[in-house]
């Protein structure tokens, strides 16, 4: 694999500490993915981890541990970087997931998109694990020079072997559940790392447009994500938000799943939050969401890449207040994402039922019956003690209707601008 790292020392934005503070790769040891020289040691630690071996035994119960680990060591030969690890180990796993759990994946990007550049792919969020995994496969198969480093919340890294595995797979850690002071420091460090990764390590980054998945599929870019991007920019950006964001080469990305296997779990959350004051998800809930998302049926899956927003950012008035700039950038990213949804019959059916509209030219009676059967099957999985059937159904329908609503609004706004 091509390695074009040119990292040595990086000058941080003065708000990260003392002005001109020099940062190198080891400044980010607490959050960064593993470097090539660390991979062999960590791989051996994985093979000696009891819980990891139990998981591997579940996949190949007929193989003795010594044989299984011997085969894994053989596969690891020649792995010199995290990208090599992705191609050797993760690519076959992701292909298996696509074969078993989808009705096919497709990927689109502008014809003139520079596949040798480095970007932040900022997307809506559908699955905790697979959003970035599918993207990496699509980028690799689509001729992009690099796959992505990804941000993953430490609330999901509940076992040491999981943390090791994701860091081998180009993941950096996003810390959750912090105090306000800790959050400021953590956000600054992550921002500095993202700038460092894109411009010094020469890596692509995938990150979601908001913290956590939008439970109702109303995908909106959080200002806080854009503020985090800007806060760790290098000195030469001179505290200018537009220059700071252009330094990251943000390319909006739209992810469209025909079916969300976690839709019934999200509906459950809505009822629990409505009925149980102070209810919060447990670690077990997070694990169930991860497992359901990975193993559940998704139907058709489509990824659509938008043009990098650097040129558009250059048209903004630099004298605008920061708050206004963040608002305009978030709205532009949302329009790019919303206008590129791949809409399926179930989306139109859901909106018609909720809004009383008639888009029957977008689906057949067979489509409607199949979606009704799908909803009934998902509703049967609900674990709420006293399920409010009407409420749960409305919540699930909303998840499928919102992409259509946002798509229609975005297309109308774009046509008005033109």
Label each region the model flagged.
Residues 2-119, 125-136, 140, 147, ...:
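Membrane-anchoring hydrophobic helices of lipid-metabolizing enzymes
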Residues 7-20, 238-244, 315-324, 357-363, ...:
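Intrinsically disordered, low-complexity coil segments
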Residues 11-12, 90-310, 314, 381-385:
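Soluble catalytic domains of membrane acyltransferases
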Residues 80, 84, 177-184, 216, ...:
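Charge-dense, low-complexity intrinsically disordered segments
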Residues 82, 223-229, 237-240, 286-287, ...:
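General structural signal for secondary-structure boundaries
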Residues 193-195, 287, 365-378, 398-402:
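Short, highly charged low-complexity linear segments
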Residues 283-353:
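C-terminal structural cap/anchor segments
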Residues 338-389:
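C-terminal structured domain segments
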């Amino acid at each position: 694999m091509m390695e074009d790292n040119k990292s040595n020392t990086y000058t941080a934005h003065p708000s990260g500490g003392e002005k001109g503070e020099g940062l190198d790769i080891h400044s980010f040891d607490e959050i960064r993915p593993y470097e090539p020289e660390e991979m062999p040691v960590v791989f051996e630690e994985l093979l000696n981890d009891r819980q990891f071996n139990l998981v591997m035994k579940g996949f190949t119960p007929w193989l003795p541990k010594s044989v299984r680990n011997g085969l894994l060591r053989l596969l690891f030969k020649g792995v010199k970087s995290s990208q090599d690890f992705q191609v050797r180990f993760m690519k076959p796993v992701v292909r298996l997931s696509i074969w078993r759990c989808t009705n096919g994946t497709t990927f689109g990007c502008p014809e003139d998109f520079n596949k040798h550049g480095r970007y932040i792919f900022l997307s809506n969020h559908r699955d905790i694990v697979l959003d970035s995994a599918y993207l990496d496969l699509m980028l690799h198969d689509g001729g992009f020079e690099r796959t992505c480093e990804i941000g993953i919340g430490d609330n999901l890294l509940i076992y040491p072997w999981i943390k090791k595995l994701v860091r081998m797979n180009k993941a950096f850690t996003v810390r959750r559940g912090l105090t306000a002071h800790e959050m400021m420091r953590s956000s600054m460090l992550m921002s500095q790392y993202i700038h460092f990764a894109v411009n010094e390590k020469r890596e692509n980054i995938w990150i979601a447009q908001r913290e956590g998945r939008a439970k109702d599929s109303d995908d909106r870019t959080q200002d806080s994500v854009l503020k985090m991007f800007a806060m760790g920019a290098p000195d030469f950006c001179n505290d200018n938000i537009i220059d700071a964001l252009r330094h990251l080469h943000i390319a909006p990305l739209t992810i469209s799943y025909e079916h969300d296997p976690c839709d019934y779990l999200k509906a459950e959350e809505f009822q629990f939050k409505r009925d149980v004051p102070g209810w919060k998800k447990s670690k077990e809930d997070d694990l169930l969401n991860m497992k359901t998302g990975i193993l559940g049926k998704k139907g058709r899956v489509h990824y659509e890449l938008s043009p990098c927003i650097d040129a558009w950012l250059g048209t903004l008035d630099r004298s605008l207040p920061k708050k206004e700039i963040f608002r305009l950038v978030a709205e532009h990213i949302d329009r790019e994402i919303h206008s590129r949804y791949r809409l399926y019959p179930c989306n139109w059916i859901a909106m018609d039922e909720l809004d009383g509209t008639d888009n029957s030219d977008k689906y057949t009676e067979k489509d409607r019956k199949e979606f009704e059967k799908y909803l009934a099957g998902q509703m049967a999985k609900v674990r709420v003690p006293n399920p409010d059937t009407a409420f749960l159904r409305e919540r699930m329908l909303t998840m499928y209707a919102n992409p259509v609503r946002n798509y229609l609004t975005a297309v109308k706004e774009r046509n008005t601008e033109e």
